[in-house]
């Protein structure tokens, strides 16, 4: 239904568990009608079944790989920096627990400082966690604390995801990641 005076009136937050398209506009007796705004939302995905299956290194005591999927933007995965100085690239692989059709992913860099924020990256998807093929997307993240969304040219079906850091924003050898999430359009298994 198109927004209009007879459409359902917004009266508070509502669940959009399966994602969808939301159209909104403002109407009133003593105001001009607004233009229609449209936003598409992905499937709401629980991380209960997610697990990190591989990270090439981590900093003991603060940079555990599980922090990249714990939903807390203040925690982070950080590759080892106090012992060895393993150079880029660095990577993390995640089992989503179920197959999904993905249209993209989101990245949240470290919030409390710049150290380890990813600059150049590659993102892969796999059905079995072994055959990764070519990257779905290669790109460069902005050096900030904002959530960054990356969309794919076409949807992909997978159960495993892999983020590879090719470089760090200051040129350092280590990597950090506050949160990674998926933009799913379909849940294919339960």
Mark where each language-model region is:
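Short beta-strand-plus-loop segments that form exposed binding edges in beta-rich domains
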Residues: 164-171
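Short beta-strand elements bearing conserved aromatic residues within extracellular beta-rich modules
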Residues: 121-123
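Short, surface-exposed tryptophan/glycine-enriched loops
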Residues: 146-160
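Low-complexity, disordered linker/stalk regions enriched in Pro/Thr/Ser/Gly
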Residues: 1-56, 61-64
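Surface-exposed loop/edge segments in extracytoplasmic proteins
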Residues: 2-7, 130-137
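Disordered, acidic Ser/Thr/Pro-rich linker "stalks" and the adjacent N-terminal cap
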Residues: 37-99, 110-117, 131, 140-146, ...
């Amino acid at each position: 239904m198109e927004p209009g005076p007879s459409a359902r009136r917004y009266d508070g937050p509502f669940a959009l568990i399966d994602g969808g398209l939301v159209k909104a506009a403002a109407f009133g007796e003593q105001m001009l009608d607004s233009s229609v705004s449209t936003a598409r939302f992905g499937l709401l995905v629980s991380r209960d079944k997610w697990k990190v299956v591989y990270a090439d290194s981590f900093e003991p005591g603060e940079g555990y790989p599980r922090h990249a999927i714990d939903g807390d933007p203040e925690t982070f995965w950080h590759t080892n920096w106090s012992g060895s100085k393993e150079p880029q690239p660095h990577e993390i692989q995640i089992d989503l627990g179920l197959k999904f059709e993905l249209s993209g992913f989101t990245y949240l860099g470290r919030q409390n400082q710049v150290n380890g924020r990813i600059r150049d990256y590659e993102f892969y998807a796999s059905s079995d966690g072994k055959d990764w093929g070519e990257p779905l997307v290669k790109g460069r993240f902005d050096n900030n604390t904002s959530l960054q969304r990356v969309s794919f040219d076409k949807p992909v079906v997978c159960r495993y995801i892999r983020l590879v850091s090719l470089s760090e924003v200051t040129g350092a050898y280590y990597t950090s990641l506050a949160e990674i999430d998926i933009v799913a359009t379909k849940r294919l298994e339960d």
